[in-house]
Amino acid sequence: MDIEKRILELREILNYHSHKYYVEDAPEISDFEYDELYRELEKLEQERPDLITPDSPTQRIGGKPLEGFKKVVHAVQMQSLSDVFSREELLAFDRRVREAVGDDVEYVVEKKIDGLSVSLVYENGVFTRGATRGDGLVGEDVTQNLKTIRTIPLRLKRDLPLLEVRGEVFISKKDFIKINEEQEAAGQQLFANPRNAAAGSLRQLDPKVTSQRKLDIFVFNIQRIEGQSFKTHSETLEFLKELGFKTSPGYKVCKDINAVWEEINRIGEERGEIDFEIDGAVVKVNSLEQREILGSTIKAPRWAVAYKYPAEVKETVVKKITVNVGRTGVLTPIAIFDPVRLAGSTVSRATLHNMDYIKEKDIRIGDTVRIRKAGDIIPEVVDVVFEKRSGNEAEFNMPEQCPVCGADVVREEGEAAYRCTGIECSAQLYRKIVHFASRDAMNIEGLGPAIIEVLLEKGLIKEIADLYYLHKEKETLVNIERMGKKSVENLLASIEKSKQNNIDRLIFGFGIRHIGLRAAQLLSENFESLDALMNASAEDIMAIPEFGEKMAKSVEQFFRQKQNRDTVEKLKAAGVNTVSFGKKKIKDNRFEGKTFVLTGTLPSFTRKEAEEIIKSFGGKTSGSVSKKTDYVLAGEDAGSKLQKAKELGIEIIDEDKFRKMIE
């Protein structure tokens, strides 16, 4: 096989299907088939690293966390827009435009996406740099994080010498809700709105975290270009589509300001139904020649304005407070109130987040409350109208048993969240199975989120253990759209293979609160079987030096639940290993008691590979340099850690020295 030819072919195939899926929303192959092609490319590139290029689909997610963001001076200033808040102000803008360029003016109206503005630079058709807007003159280099956004092409469909475009990075309303559910489940601070979530995700130092946040982008302007010219803005938008960009959705060319006003009203009526947050409508002069005449002020162009929609607040009465159990097991109180029309839709419920939120606002059943839509998306209770309180209102208390499965509900000290402890609670099953099948848990290849959703929808799995009985449903699986015989055979083989895992993977796969990979390994090393662990008390578990009371009680609480014990029995009946392989022996402990810190890029090791080698010799790794650090392993572009090591007199080694140490 000609490896170079096959690599080029695979890149072309993967780029085509990625565009069909992420930009056009019209997939032609299954997720499993895409993953198999991706893995083939990954394998070939590992064999021939000299053929890896920056625009390869495998290079979207960087291998190592960054130590900071470099500053970028924008070649073209990224200006903001002047705001208008009424029809009168819009008409005044139109008068100023016509006074400067005459009455023959055409406008383009676009939705104003409420996200984070970025610039993307392409050289000879390849994405080379991306930066945040910053103050408009200087931004931050976030190239590696932008590469994780699937709707940003790494290579254009035309090899233009130079192209710089501007776009808005955002998170859809649906994904924003999921992210906040995950934040809440992890006991972390919630994002106030999708814009904050997008900004926080794009500025993560670890691109792998960014890649999990489902960021998206709409590209809406050409900042500079070589090898092409245009007469109108609408022409540039169509050209950007041809290059492979996802552009401003549903823009409209308007012949006069009255048509502009009609379009603004239409967008305003529909904004509650759009799956991304908008904070207005942008009105732009279409003619690029007229734009040149109009020019700009220091901060904003004279040829465009942003119309901002007014916020709505309504009063209603809380009829009852129910409890929703999320995919992570967190119980969330929901206020049910008299239906009201708000921001384009009728709403009758709003999340109350947790008991701390309810107590802080003193919300009671029967209260008159004021509500609004945060960012025109999520209904929220602003406050209680205390002057309308009658004295007959009732306080709300969180249930002690899960309303879905009946398992115990617990609230750990220092946390706001109440959680269901049942592993097979149907409300949280999807997330549990995704985690159970993940690489660090049972490592079931081919069982990704999309396949799991299908299996749940078809009723083929109702609990984790059902995965190991799927072979009985082979004919049904083969007939499911986008799966096929080969995909099903591979999936079933992977499930069968996972039965032989050590129990540390199974323990981690259960998703027990506070039990990560290392904790699961320690439990496996200290208990000979899952039965022994299930019958252990918190005191028994705390005999492991690394285990504190919180971790030990979490394990005890988990295995105390009958449904969790039943799951273990069903797994055993299916042939899943529940006996420990014993403590992993370190053959060579030359690094015992030594702590390493890694910084920069190593020529031939990934950071994870180097860390695993250090641990295999009994050493430890740390993310920061201190007096307790023994060695700093430094590669190219080493950052502040290297400087701190020099200041503290820590021994600094390069890859060559490291190789000699492990020979």
From Swiss-Prot:
**Residues annotated for NAD(+) binding in this entry:** D31, F32, E33, Y34, D35, S80, L81, E110, R133, E168, K284, K308
Q: Give an example GO biological process.
A: DNA replication
Q: Name one Pfam family in it.
A: Nlig-Ia
Residue ranges constituting the BRCT domain according to the UniProt record: 586-663
Which sites bind Zn(2+)?
C402, C405, C420, C425
- Which sites are catalytic? K112
**Has UniProt tagged this entry with the keyword Ubl conjugation?**
no
Q: Which cofactor does it need?
A: Mg(2+); Mn(2+)
Q: Which InterPro entries match?
A: BRCT_dom (IPR001357), BRCT_dom_sf (IPR036420), DisA/LigA_HHH (IPR041663), DNA_ligase (IPR001679), DNA_ligase_AS (IPR018239), DNAligase_adenylation (IPR013839), DNAligase_N (IPR013840), Hlx-hairpin-Hlx_DNA-bd_motif (IPR003583)
GO MF: DNA binding; DNA ligase (NAD+) activity; metal ion binding
Please provide the record's keywords in A-Z order.
Answer: DNA damage, DNA repair, DNA replication, Ligase, Magnesium, Manganese, Metal-binding, NAD, Zinc
Give me the reactions it catalyses.
Answer: NAD(+) + (deoxyribonucleotide)n-3'-hydroxyl + 5'-phospho-(deoxyribonucleotide)m = (deoxyribonucleotide)n+m + AMP + beta-nicotinamide D-nucleotide
Main enzyme class: ligase
What Enzyme Commission number does this protein have?
6.5.1.2
Q: Which cysteines are joined by disulfide bonds?
A: none
The reply to whether Cell membrane figures as a keyword in the UniProt entry is: no
User: HAMAP family in the record, alphabetically?
Assistant: DNA_ligase_A
Entry's family note:
Belongs to the NAD-dependent DNA ligase family. LigA subfamily.
The function of this protein is: DNA ligase that catalyzes the formation of phosphodiester linkages between 5'-phosphoryl and 3'-hydroxyl groups in double-stranded DNA using NAD as a coenzyme and as the energy source for the reaction. It is essential for DNA replication and repair of damaged DNA.
- What name appears for this protein in its UniProt entry? DNA ligase
Q: Which organism is it from?
A: Acetivibrio thermocellus (strain ATCC 27405 / DSM 1237 / JCM 9322 / NBRC 103400 / NCIMB 10682 / NRRL B-4536 / VPI 7372) (Clostridium thermocellum)
**Gene label:** ligA
